[in-house]
A protein has these predicted regions:
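AMP-binding/adenylate-forming catalytic core of the ANL superfamily
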Residues: 107, 360, 370, 375-376, ...
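Conserved C-terminal "lid"/linker of ANL adenylate-forming enzymes
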Residues: 445-448, 477-532
Length: 833
């Protein structure tokens, strides 16, 4: 396996029907099997080629994590082109700069980045619709790529400075992934939850390429809120997680809250004390109830991007989860060292991975080389020469040392870059330049300063007038990206900043002095909170405000409706996600984090919560009819009872069975509803391969208003209740759960029985199910040539009627198709049979 093309091709051959990429965007899981990837990627490459992409071109990939990101990434590689991934949080200015530097031909974007992507002035392919477009395209042969072919250019996250693009080849990425396959306990039965941005090489290599080389599955959550993540863990039985330290703390905090809410703190701490003295299997047994909240399969968490909190890591280790930490750099493809489960020393970043060499320079800098090392920076020979020495060693700019046991320890950054707890990187020079654009600033220095468990961007200013401090910070933040926002500031009291003999600012001296100054950012209440209006609150204070205040560590009386979550209350991107998770836990209301703007006000958050109160997620499984015993009984009833009964009253002819292939499902079958026995006719005449995996959506208000009738329907027809009015979300979740298990769905789009016809207008929900189901829709028409006495129910009538069951060709609806349009097209397809 030498190239990304090989990953897809060999994966399809080796792992075939195993699920590769999974996501549940609405009521049903969309899954791409390994064979699907092998078939879809060459077709998606055709779509990109027809949009103007050729061998050697660059394509900007600016989209959120989802399976289609991987499809686009591999399709670009298939053409011999290079991906240029951008973080969804990057600014338009940054995107323009990268597009200009690389001469990109195209941008692949998602709906979350639509506004920014359009500003680049390049042709756009929408990532959500790429698989649909690929399905209609012919596959294209792969370009003659080799391990040395450029696969992608990954740019630093600096916004106001000149970003550098690290050039990574196919061989760099494959070498790092295959080396990590020897380090991480990863296999075909594992499922990894992808939460870190795929634009970051750590997630891309360890969270996408590596799993696909070993036959594992990658699950994409629809939100990063802790409550949603935990539900995703549970629903998909996730076993491996890659995360940044702050994200780990969010999950840990969610567990701690549940412990306190259940009043089990003393018991919880006793279990931890016992766990320190027993082997891993017993640890997992002690914390079985906690781990079951995560699906019961979680065994490994890999942490990267910034320093791991040893106390938090210890808590997870005591629960029987291996806590592994890595160190690396984009320029090394990216992993340099990683701890091993059998040699895991918390507080270190482990040993060099196979094939990578590491040495410590005389000044303490970490130097590395190996097959993952990049070739250089895009069109920047000066920066390349500064990073790679004559002997081929990459100079990381980081300081470290080896322990006597050969473990690498990270001691800080030689270069002036801040690693925030959410994994984002901020170059101090970029923020300083934004501050210095203001003529009122004589000089500025930016440092990372502790606030709670992580670092915040803190500005130290030399001003003639300290009264303008807040104005200067606010103006600079308008020019900075969300992750670069200045969270605290200090006016330097001396005439000048401390400097070296060469007049460089001495930031260690600044950090030491900040301890004694009046407004350090390390105060328990964020400095920015002082800007919030402090008004007395009465007993009717909104509970959302109380939750916000608790997370921001401020008095609720200090939180005004006009306070901005980011700039006033210092909540970074992951803290805003945590906020929505706490709101869901405490109020039962789910708010999609995509709906919350980075700098939304408290009032806007409250409005979002109120708007979402009527959209609470339903629960319920109705799983008992799916048990093998019940299904065997049901199929027996169909063969021994339903078939002869239907045959007594109707002669049934069937056409179109060639359109049904059990391997291409699950299908959604949409017949007209014109006879009392139409359910029996369909159930008894469909092929057994389809029927044994068939579930019927039955009207909850008619079939399930009688207990005996509902039980019989569930046993014989594998029916489940579908609400025609209200409670729709729960019904859709029941429908989706069956499709996720491979069941075909029989649903009557008219919504009611009209004996003898004519065909009634289809309900609007039919289009929603057809589009969001993401599966082939099979139109079916029951043609009545002569009605039986059982349906006509009057004399004189024939005892035995004559009907024809016509099965049409499957129809696919593209993601994004208007639901009303889909309903109209589906109705027309049934009428035309």
């Amino acid at each position: 396996m030498d190239t990304l093309v090989d990953v897809v091709r060999l994966g399809g051959a080796r792992f075939d029907r195993r699920p590769a990429l999974l996501i549940r965007p609405f009521f049903r899981t969309r899954a791409w099997r390994y064979r699907d990837l092998a078939e879809t990627v060459p077709r998606a490459a055709r779509v990109l080629a027809e949009a103007g992409v050729g061998e050697g071109d660059r394509v900007i990939l600016w989209a959120v994590n989802r399976p289609e990101w991987g499809i686009a990434f591999f399709a670009i590689a298939h053409l011999g082109a290079a991906s240029v991934p951008l973080d969804v949080r990057h600014t338009v200015d940054f995107g323009r700069k990268i597009a200009g530097q690389t001469g990109a031909k195209l941008v692949v974007a998602s709906r979350q980045t639509e506004t920014s992507a359009r500003e680049l002035g390049l042709p756009i392919v929408w990532i959500e619709s790429l698989p649909d477009s690929a399905r209609r395209a012919k596959p294209v042969e792969p370009a003659p790529v080799t391990g040395a072919t450029l696969a992608e250019i990954v740019f630093t996250s600096g916004t106001t400075g000149e970003p550098k693009g690290a050039m990574l080849s196919h061989g760099n990425l494959i070498a790092n992934a295959t080396a990590m396959a020897q380090v991480m306990p990863f296999g075909e039965k594992d499922r990894l939850l992808s939460v870190l941005p795929l634009s970051h090489l750590y997630e891309q290599v360890l969270g996408l390429i590596l799993p696909l080389t070993v036959g594992a599955s990658v699950v994409y959550p629809v939100s990063r809120q802790p409550a949603v993540l935990i539900r995703t863990f549970r629903d998909f039985k996730v076993s491996v997680l890659l995360i940044v330290p702050q994200g780990l703390r969010l999950l840990d905090a969610a567990i701690e809250r549940r412990v306190d809410q259940a009043d089990r703190r003393a018991t919880f701490e006793r279990l931890h004390a016992i766990a320190r003295r027993v082997p891993k299997p017993f640890k997992r047994l002690l914390f079985r109830s906690v781990l079951s909240q995560f699906g019961g399969r979680l065994h490994t968490i890999g942490v990267g991007a910034s320093a791991l909190d040893v106390d938090v890591a210890t808590r997870w280790t005591e629960m029987g989860v291996d806590m592994l930490q890595g160190y690396g750099a984009t320029e090394m493809g990216p992993v340099i060292s990683f701890t091993r489960p059998h040699r895991n020393v918390l507080g270190t970043v482990g040993e060099p991975i196979p094939g990578v060499e590491v040495r410590i320079a005389e000044d303490g800098e970490i130097l590395a080389t190996g097959p993952g090392r990049f070739a250089g920076y895009w069109k920047n020979p000066e920066a390349t020469a500064a990073a790679i020495d004559a002997d081929g060693w990459y100079h990381t700019g980081d300081l470290g040392a080896f322990t006597k046991d050969g473990m690498l320890t990270f001691r800080g950054r030689k270069k002036d870059m801040l690693a925030l707890p959410d994994g984002q990187k901020v170059y101090a020079e970029d923020v300083e330049n934004a501050l210095k654009e203001d003529v009122r600033v004589r000089d500025a220095a930016v440092v990372g300063w502790p606030l709670g468990p992580g670092l915040k961007v803190h500005a130290v200013l030399l001003l003639d007038d300290s009264e303008v401090e807040d104005e200067i910070i606010a103006a600079a933040n308008l020019r900075l990206a969300p992750h670069q926002q200045i969270r605290g500031s200090t006016v330097w009291p001396d005439e000048d900043l401390p400097r070296t003999t060469t007049l460089k600012v001495r930031k260690p001296d600044i950090l030491a002095r900040l301890e004694d100054l009046e407004r350090p950012a390390s105060a328990p209440i964020p400095a920015a909170a002082s800007k919030v209006r402090r008004e007395a609150l009465d007993a009717s204070v909104d509970p959302v405000t109380v939750i916000v205040a608790g997370l921001a560590n401020v008095d609720p009386a200090a939180v005004a409706d006009t306070a901005h979550l980011s700039t006033d209350l210092d909540l970074d991107s992951l803290q805003r996600v945590e906020l929505l998770g706490i709101i869901e836990e405490e109020t039962g209301v789910f708010v999609d984090d995509d709906a919350l703007a980075p700098d939304a006000t408290v009032a806007e958050l409250i409005a979002l919560v109120e708007a979402a109160r009527d959209a609470k997620r339903g629960v319920g499984a109705w799983n008992w009819p799916l048990s093998p015993l019940v299904r065997a009984v049901g199929i027996g009833f169909q063969i021994l009872l339903i078939y002869p009964f239907v045959s007594l009253f109707y002669r049934v002819r069937v056409s179109g069975l060639e359109h049904l292939n059990p391997d291409d499902g699950p299908y959604i079958l949409t017949p007209n509803h014109c006879l009392h026995l139409d359910n029996g006719i369909i159930l008894s005449r469909l092929p057994l391969g389809i029927r044994r995996k068939l579930a019927v959506a039955a009207a909850a208000d008619t079939i399930y208003d009688n207990l005996l009738q509902g039980v019989l329907a569930s046993v014989i027809a594998n029916a489940f209740p579908l609400q025609r009015e209200g409670g729709v979300r729960k019904s859709l979740e029941l429908l989706g759960a069956r499709m996720d298990k491979g069941y075909n769905i029989l649903i009557y789009p008219e919504g009611k029985l009209t004996v003898g016809g004519p065909l009634q207008p289809f309900k609007a929900g039919a289009g929603l199910i057809a589009v969001e189901g993401g599966t082939p829709i099979v139109p079916i028409k029951l043609k009545i040539h002569r009605m039986s006495i059982i349906d006509r129910r009057r004399f004189p009538s024939a005892l035995r009627g004559d009907v024809e069951l016509v099965i049409g060709a499957p129809i696919w609806f593209d993601i994004g198709t208007d639901h009303a349009t889909a309903t109209t097209q589906l109705e027309a397809a049934v009428r035309a049979l």
